[in-house]
């Protein structure tokens, strides 16, 4: 993270009358938490704020209760103010139907921590060393001189605790930031449970079926191993995006595999693929080869074909 870029973003957001904040498609806690934290801070400074995400899927119920959610507007209701900020979107494509709102802005900015993000705004605050976008938003709020109260801190904590896997792969700076957010009033026990440890019973039935069909390919990744599971479209029926996405965090625990993959059938012959690695394999170029992106140890992409074909496509890339 460069303090100068955070300061530059803060200057751009000072004394502006209105701002549109865009979150990425299939929103998670980092993009929504970052968007709402920034939105609340700007609103308190007299700025007209709207926060939106491409509503191809509903907002997860765990995120709907975050402070500041009244700032959220439906994608079709977005005004599109002259100043637009994208939070946690690794590429313009991740804004999906709202990409045109971003490109039409008089002044556009991105705040993001994905290594695959090469920058697509007029001003880009991108730091792949940051554990989540929320910590970058915090740096901007500090430059703005915003008081971090319990509401803003809660939204930032949501992004931090989820993107670090409940701090399992957090950097030392993230623990210091977490302590600061807790001091500001975050109810860590409640929000950690809501965001990470809460599932409907039908999720257990889906997981049982998926894990029963998991496959290990020990020779993949030059002998480091791949474990993968397939979530058929019938199993996704009635499941939220976040519930299906959580499967990969179970699959990745297999000791015998460096890389884990979960193939989710979102439609006829269409798939989203979630990838995780433990230490040695950089997933960014693998995902990028399929038009996706993400982080070194957590990436994803979309593919088309039969289940056997999309698995074969991945194996060819490893």
Question: What are the residue ranges of the model-derived segments?
Answer:
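Short alpha-helices
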Residues: 111-179
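Active-site cofactor/cluster-binding pocket
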Residues: 64-67, 72-122
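Glycine-rich, phosphate-binding/catalytic loops in enzymes
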Residues: 38-39, 101-104, 126-127, 177-178
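Conserved beta-strand scaffold positions in the cores of enzyme catalytic domains, especially
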Residues: 108-110, 124-125, 226-228, 262
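Hydrophobic helix-and-loop "lid/oligomerization" segment in the mid-to-C-terminal part
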Residues: 2-25, 33-61, 80-81, 157, ...
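An acidic intrinsically disordered interaction segment
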Residues: 1-8, 100-108, 129-131, 135-137
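Short, hinge-like loop/turn segments at secondary-structure boundaries
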Residues: 67-71, 126-129, 278-279
């Amino acid at each position: 993270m460069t303090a100068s870029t955070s300061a530059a973003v803060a200057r751009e957001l000072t004394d502006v009358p209105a701002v549109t904040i865009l979150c990425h498609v299939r929103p998670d806690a980092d993009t929504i938490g970052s968007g709402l934290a920034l939105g609340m801070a700007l609103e308190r400074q007299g700025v007209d704020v709207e926060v939106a995400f491409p509503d191809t899927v509903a907002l997860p119920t765990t995120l709907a209760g975050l402070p500041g959610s009244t700032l959220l507007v439906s994608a079709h209701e977005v005004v599109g103010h002259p100043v637009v900020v994208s939070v946690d979107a690794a590429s313009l494509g991740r804004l999906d139907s709202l990409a045109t709102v971003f490109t039409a802005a008089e002044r556009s900015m991105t705040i993001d921590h994905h290594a695959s993000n090469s920058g697509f705004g007029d001003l880009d605050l991108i730091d792949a060393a940051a554990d989540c976008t929320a910590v970058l938003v915090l740096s901007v709020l500090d430059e703005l001189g915003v008081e971090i109260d319990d509401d803003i801190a809660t939204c930032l904590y949501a992004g931090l605790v989820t993107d670090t896997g409940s701090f399992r792969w957090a950097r030392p700076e993230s623990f210091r930031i977490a302590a600061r957010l807790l001091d500001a009033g975050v109810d860590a026990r409640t929000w950690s449970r809501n965001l990470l440890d809460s599932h409907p019973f039908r999720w257990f039935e889906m997981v049982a079926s998926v894990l029963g069909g998991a496959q290990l390919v020990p020779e993949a990744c030059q002998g480091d191993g791949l474990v993968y599971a397939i979530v058929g479209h019938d199993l996704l029926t009635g499941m939220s995006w976040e519930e299906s996405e959580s499967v990969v965090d179970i699959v990745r625990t297999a000791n015998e595999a460096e890389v884990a993959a979960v193939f989710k059938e979102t439609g006829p012959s269409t798939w989203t693929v979630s990838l995780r690695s433990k230490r040695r394999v950089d997933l960014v170029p693998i995902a990028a080869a399929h038009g996706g992106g993400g982080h070194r140890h957590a990436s994803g992409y979309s593919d088309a074909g039969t289940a056997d074909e999309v698995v074969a496509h991945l194996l060819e890339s490893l």
